[in-house]
């Protein structure tokens, strides 16, 4: 799917709640994202699993809501279940996430707190964004010699998404 068609169905300037790895897990995933982006001319972004995305609001209020959500969510583990890809710019190549009751509870809590009604949710950790052929994605998959199988979620983060300029910023 071309970027333009993705943009027409999404809030291109919005906020998201991210679950992010730390320490060595973050370092490994960050290196893989940078390597793929460099090799295949993709944008750089921090490794993350999106909990909720596409919402709007005043940043100060969203930060308070993020803190409230964070206090209510108990730490849990994100477990990966292989590599997959779609013909979509923002889910071009990704690690599938095993859905767990803790992840589901965190999602419901975040959606409730943010008054967000989006029901579609496919938890994943993107490795590259872009429009690539199946052949290119095959080469990418072959380059994934080893990828972590899980990471601990101890905090959540508010991120600003600028999908027009392909820039993402973790606010807090």
Report each predicted region and the residues it spans:
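Short, basic/glycine-rich phosphate-binding loops at helix/coil junctions
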Residues: 84-94
């Amino acid at each position: 799917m071309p970027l333009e068609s993705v943009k027409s169905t999404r809030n291109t300037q919005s906020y998201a709640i991210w679950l992010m790895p730390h320490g060595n897990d973050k370092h490994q995933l960050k290196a893989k994202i940078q390597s793929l982006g460099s090799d295949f001319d993709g944008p750089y972004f921090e490794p993350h699993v999106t909990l909720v995305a596409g919402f709007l609001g005043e940043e100060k209020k969203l930060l308070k809501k993020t803190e409230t959500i964070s206090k209510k969510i108990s730490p849990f583990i994100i477990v990966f279940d292989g590599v997959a890809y779609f013909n979509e710019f923002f889910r071009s190549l990704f690690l599938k996430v095993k859905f767990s009751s803790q992840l589901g509870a965190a999602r419901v809590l975040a959606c409730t707190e943010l008054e967000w009604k989006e029901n579609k949710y496919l938890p994943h950790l993107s490795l590259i964004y872009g429009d690539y052929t199946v052949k290119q994605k095959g080469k990418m998959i072959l380059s994934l010699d080893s990828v972590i199988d899980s990471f601990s979620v101890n905090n959540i983060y508010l991120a600003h998404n600028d999908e027009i300029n392909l820039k993402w910023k973790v606010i807090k």
